[in-house]
């Protein structure tokens, strides 16, 4: 019997089961319930399901399904706690402006009569009351991970100097904060960050005010010696523009030059991610922060980041990265360092993951290709997304950034070894993708291919719906014998002597133009890629924008190769592939591992934004 297996084996089995399966197994017997319940409730996520009502968490629902005694028994096993909300349309000023008044402690005031300050206090009070119900059920000193991903201010009772985390959960090792820096009240309540002195991994996005930077600096002063991963993101504003890396490591603004020996160092840091943070214009290697312990570096739209890469490429003690992500706009940086990324890539070897999102960058020619080629023997993942200013009309008076295909894509096989690269993402159209991938298809080891474009460019389209509609039409044509699903895009297979068949195909083709042309091109490429004449190693194909979770859900589509041993052709519109979703963790864990993280790399903008961006 399954429930007679040793506990060690059952724990090992649970590691390979999805959460729903673990819950189901725990109901089989009392022994399995005792073993699997701690696993089920080890990680808890509470959500605000509606971003227009961010003060309404599903805490009430949790206690509705668990009476207080059972909830306390379940939550005492919790080690990882997360509060989360979607961030799609509401990307700034998320607090009191997007809430449902729960009427707790209103003292007879109508919502319309409430001032902005009172409304904000009531909003945080609503959150505090719900969060405190969860806190009351946790075992003291039990949390190892705390995540506040609501994109709002944090109630003061959580992070203040004498708050809950500092008093009852001081052993947190992983801290993830997503706050609303655009809120005018987001300046207080974080003074207790410095009381958490065992944190190894910090991620904080949405910083804008100087008081927040002071809280972060106090935290870094207490944790810099053992911090292993640091991710910091500012939100653009008149305040944040005057803040820089110097403020974080303990230096004043000065002249932008790091030369003070009293700044903090990070001897254990292996992962660093900086977003929209002004970097020093000069960064001597023997002073301030050292990058030489890093194995992963991510720089997203940081002023002077090209200068930093240029300086690092000249250092005698070369940096040895496994992963590099760089997103930047050439119009906002120094023209003298246009080749900084190429020089940096040529300065070391051994890179495994490279993610680049470049806007308005001049043609780099062979130098850039050689920079990628320097890591040909080790490179496994490559993302390259390029955008350039393009005129909106024939007059050329107005321009905006548009996606473009890389000018070096014709040299793809020279730049990368397709026998090594398993994940590849390019801002390229399906037809061009086939042209550059087909010559090396037989020895290619490509498992995940992502044809990227920027979601905001296609907000007026529902690409996912268009592709599904086209698949349905082709399936209907197949069911009445007009054409086989895979032959729709193969003109030489059409029977032109059958009038009814020709008429139906012509109607499909006319309906696909112009608004379905992109969907048709993608399906044509997918038909080839998963066919015997395509890429044998390919397991999944993505199209569109997968950044920021589900923000661009209508501007993306994902398909995978059909497994003949498990799925009949009747389950698919096509014989060789089936659609699936990013949230299908079973599929990802089955054969693609970190595929979802790869698809979300190099976002075109921030998760949180600012009115200054518009």
Predicted regions and their residues:
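Conserved phosphate-coordination/catalytic loops
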Residues: 122-126, 210, 251-253, 335, ...
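Residue-level marker of regulatory loop/turn positions in helix-turn-helix DNA-binding domains and
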Residues: 2, 6, 333, 404
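Core solenoid repeat modules with strong leucine/isoleucine-rich periodicity
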Residues: 206, 232-234, 270-271, 275-276, ...
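A structural signal for leucine-rich repeat
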Residues: 163-169, 190-197, 215-226, 241-267, ...
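Short, solvent-exposed loop/turn at the beta-strand->alpha-helix junction
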Residues: 91, 127, 152-159, 181-186, ...
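N-terminal adaptor/linker regions at the entrance to substrate-recognition repeat cores
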Residues: 1-281, 290-298, 304, 468-509, ...
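Conserved hydrophobic position(s) of the canonical leucine-rich repeat
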Residues: 78, 143, 172, 199, ...
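Leucine-rich solenoid repeat modules
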Residues: 13-16, 68, 134-137, 148-149, ...
């Amino acid at each position: 019997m399954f429930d007679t297996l040793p506990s060690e084996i059952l724990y090992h089995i649970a590691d390979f089961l999805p959460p729903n399966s673990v819950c189901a197994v725990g109901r089989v017997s009392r022994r399995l319930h005792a073993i699997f319940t701690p696993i089920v409730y080890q990680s808890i996520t509470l959500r605000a399901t509606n971003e227009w009502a961010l003060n309404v968490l599903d805490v009430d629902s949790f206690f509705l399904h668990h009476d207080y005694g059972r909830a306390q028994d379940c939550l005492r096993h919790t080690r990882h706690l997360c509060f989360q909300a979607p961030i799609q349309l509401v990307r700034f000023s998320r607090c009191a402006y997007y809430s449902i008044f729960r009427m707790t402690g209103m003292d007879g005031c109508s919502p319309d009569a409430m001032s902005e300050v009172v409304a904000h206090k009531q909003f945080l009070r609503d959150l505090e009351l719900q969060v405190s119900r969860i806190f009351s059920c946790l075992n003291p000193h039990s949390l190892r991970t705390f995540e506040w991903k609501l994109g709002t201010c944090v109630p003061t009772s959580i992070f203040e100097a004498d708050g809950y985390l500092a008093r009852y959960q001081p052993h947190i090792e992983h801290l993830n904060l997503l706050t609303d820096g655009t809120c005018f009240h987001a300046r207080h309540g974080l003074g207790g960050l410095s009381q958490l002195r065992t944190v190894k991994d910090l991620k904080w996005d949405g910083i804008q005010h100087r008081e927040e930077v002071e809280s972060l600096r106090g935290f870094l002063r207490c944790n810099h010696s053992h911090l292993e991963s640091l991710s910091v993101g500012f939100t653009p504003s008149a305040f944040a523009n005057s803040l820089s890396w110097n403020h974080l490591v303990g230096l004043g603004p000065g002249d932008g030059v790091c030369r003070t020996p009293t700044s903090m160092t990070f001897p254990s840091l292996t992962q660093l991610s900086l977003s929209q943070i002004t970097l020093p214009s000069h960064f001597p290697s023997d002073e301030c922060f050292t990058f030489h312990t890093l194995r992963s570096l991510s720089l997203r739209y940081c002023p002077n980041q090209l200068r930093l890469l240029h300086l690092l490429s000249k250092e005698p003690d070369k940096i040895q990265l496994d992963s590099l992500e760089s997103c930047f706009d050439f119009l906002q940086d120094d023209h003298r360092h246009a080749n900084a990324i190429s020089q940096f890539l040529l300065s070391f070897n051994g890179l495994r993951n490279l993610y680049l999102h470049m806007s308005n960058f001049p043609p780099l020619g062979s130098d850039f290709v050689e920079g990628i080629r320097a890591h040909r023997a080790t490179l496994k993942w490559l993302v390259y997304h390029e955008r350039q200013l393009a005129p909106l009309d024939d007059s050329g008076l107005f321009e905006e950034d548009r996606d473009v295909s890389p000018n070096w894509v014709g040299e793809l096989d020279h730049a990368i070894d397709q026998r090594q690269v398993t994940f590849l993402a390019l801002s390229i159209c399906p037809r061009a993708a086939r042209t550059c991938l087909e010559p090396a298809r037989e020895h290619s080891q490509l498992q995940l291919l992502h044809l990227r474009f920027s979601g905001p460019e296609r907000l007026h389209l529902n690409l996912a719906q268009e592709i599904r509609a086209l698949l349905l039409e082709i399936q209907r044509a197949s069911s009445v014998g007009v054409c086989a699903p895979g032959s729709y895009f193969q003109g030489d297979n059409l029977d032109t002597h059958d009038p009814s068949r020709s008429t139906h195909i012509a109607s499909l083709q006319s309906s696909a133009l112009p608004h379905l042309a992109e969907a048709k091109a993608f399906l044509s490429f997918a038909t080839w890629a998963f066919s015997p004449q395509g890429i044998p190693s390919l397991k999944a194909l993505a199209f569109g924008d997968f950044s920021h979770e589900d923000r661009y859900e209508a501007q993306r589509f994902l398909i995978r190769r059909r497994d003949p041993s498990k799925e009949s052709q009747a389950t698919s519109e096509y014989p060789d592939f089936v659609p699936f979703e990013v949230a299908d963790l079973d599929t990802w864990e089955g054969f693609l591992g970190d595929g979802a993280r790869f698809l979300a790399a190099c976002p075109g903008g921030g998760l949180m934004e600012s009115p200054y961006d518009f």
